[in-house]
Amino acid sequence: MTMEEMKTEAEAASMVSMPLYAVMYPVFNELERVNLSAAQTLRAAFIKAEKENPGLTQDIIMKILEKKSVEVNFTESLLRMAADDVEEYMIERPEPEFQDLNEKARALKQILSKIPDEINDRVRFLQTIKDIASAIKELLDTVNNVFKKYQYQNRRALEHQKKEFVKYSKSFSDTLKTYFKDGKAINVFISANRLIHQTNLILQTFKTVA
């Protein structure tokens, strides 16, 4: 397996784990108000299981929905829920540049998560697309500002993640162009989820090396 194939496989594995933090983390947070110890134990168990078996959380959720005969567009629902902050990804450094990075990432995710509500209104959706483009630019500008001000030993990892984010941003743009031809909204939802995931990975990478 080539290095590029290994990176692709790793990205796919982490992408399939999105339901853990988008769906289950809010559940754990609610449970903490009732039983802190049980919530922490359950969270740790899910994290461990998901790490060892990427996609397990999604499989569990899908099985529950199937058993309850609940029909839901899981990809769309995931997109709606994926805007929330994830503590494990948020950068804790107090410097303004890092907090600005948190804020810009949050803004982009929130706009992307609104796509299901906007996509059927062409005028509103076109405005949303403009807002997404602006949010992407602002996030990249903030990433570059951090690069300029701070030196990192593991700069290569940061550069790689930035390139991945740009790649998925372009892919999202291409998906939008196709959508206006074929009208398949599900592909837009999938691409938006991937872009949200890459946004989280930017935060995670900075948090790891900062």
Swiss-Prot record:
Main subcellular location: cytoplasm
A Pfam family it matches: PDC10_C
TM stretches of this protein: none
Gene Ontology MF term list: protein homodimerization activity; protein kinase binding
Alphabetic keyword roster: Acetylation, Angiogenesis, Apoptosis, Cell membrane, Cytoplasm, Golgi apparatus, Isopeptide bond, Membrane, Ubl conjugation
Its membrane topology: Peripheral membrane protein
Gene Ontology BP terms: angiogenesis; cellular response to anoxia; cellular response to leukemia inhibitory factor; establishment of Golgi localization; Golgi reassembly; intracellular signal transduction; intrinsic apoptotic signaling pathway in response to hydrogen peroxide; negative regulation of apoptotic process
UniProt crosslink position (Glycyl lysine isopeptide (Lys-Gly) (interchain with G-Cter in SUMO2)): K184
GO CC annotations on file: cell periphery; cytoplasm; cytosol; FAR/SIN/STRIPAK complex; Golgi apparatus; Golgi membrane; plasma membrane
Quaternary structure and interacting proteins, as annotated: Homodimer. Interacts (via C-terminus) with CCM2. Interacts (via C-terminus) with PXN. Interacts (via N-terminus) with STK25. Interacts (via N-terminus) with STK26. Interacts (via N-terminus) with STK24. Interacts with GOLGA2. Identified in a complex with KRIT1 and CCM2. Interacts with KDR/VEGFR2. Interaction with KDR/VEGFR2 is enhanced by stimulation with VEGFA. Interacts with RIPOR1 (via C-terminus); this interaction is required for the association of RIPOR1 with either STK24 and STK26 kinases and occurs in a Rho-independent manner.
Family matches, as PANTHER family: PROGRAMMED CELL DEATH PROTEIN 10, TF-1 CELL APOPTOSIS RELATED PROTEIN-15
Function: Promotes cell proliferation. Modulates apoptotic pathways. Increases mitogen-activated protein kinase activity and STK26 activity. Important for cell migration, and for normal structure and assembly of the Golgi complex. Part of the striatin-interacting phosphatase and kinase (STRIPAK) complexes. STRIPAK complexes have critical roles in protein (de)phosphorylation and are regulators of multiple signaling pathways including Hippo, MAPK, nuclear receptor and cytoskeleton remodeling.
Family classification: Belongs to the PDCD10 family.
Protein name, per record: Programmed cell death protein 10
